A protein has these predicted regions:
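Nucleotide/phosphate-binding catalytic cleft detector across ATP-hydrolyzing
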Residues: 1-127, 135-200
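Conserved Rossmann-like nucleotide-cofactor binding loop
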Residues: 130
Length: 200
């Protein structure tokens, strides 16, 4: 899975995807590493197109030109936000591909292996970077859809804040994310020790 991240120095693109994410919180001050998405929506159209173009080049090498693409799009979009998605989907580098827009909750359900046609009802929860989407799907239709502006990034920051408050230790959000994932494994009842490195 490729991260939707981009690293830039001024107007020059340094890295895209996982390579850019590896630089997150490690790059010098003159290199900016961020995501073109914010709260589940496209925040920077130009950077999103660059990220997509980079990913498409990798996919074309594996699957060949002319593959089918599906865009998972949110339901609660404004006219301007819809225009951004359509502009990205109709970019010139995608013209050789078949591109379909799919409602994000439906795409989530398919990815989880939910049988949409023979389904009495399923609740789908998608925790994104800055938002969480709750959906109830039955008979292939979305009955309820609700989004809140809290996601994984806020959880990471909360973990960092708790470590700082309790142990007077400053850690980065990537370390906070790793701790969050360990603590979130509810099925694992074994206590596990974790070494955390930070700044006192």
């Amino acid at each position: 899975m490729e991260k939707n991240m981009i690293a830039s120095k001024g107007r020059r693109i340094i890295a895209v995807g996982n390579e850019a994410y590896d630089m997150f919180e490690k790059a010098p001050a003159n290199i900016v590493v961020n995501s073109p998405m914010a709260f589940g929506m496209i925040a920077n159209l130009e950077l999103q197109e660059i990220v997509l173009y980079s990913m498409m080049k990798k996919i074309d090498k594996i699957l060949g030109i002319g593959s089918v693409m599906y865009f998972a799009v949110p339901l609660d979009m404004t006219a301007i936000e819809k225009r951004a998605y359509y502009q990205v989907a109709n970019g010139h580098w995608l013209r050789k591909n078949r591109v379909y827009m799919v409602e994000a909750p439906i795409a989530d359900a398919i990815a989880m292996g939910v049988d949409l046609e023979n389904n009495a009802g399923s609740m789908i929860v998608n925790i994104g970077a800055q938002s969480t989407n709750f959906s109830i799907i039955t008979g292939g239709r979305i009955i309820i859809n609700k989004k809140i502006p809290i996601g994984g990034r806020q959880m990471n920051e909360a973990v960092c804040s708790e470590v700082r408050k309790r142990y007077n230790l400053q850690i980065g959000t990537r370390t906070g994310k790793r701790l969050k994932l360990v603590m979130g494994r509810l099925a694992d009842q074994h206590k596990q020790a974790r070494k955390v490195v930070g700044i006192c």
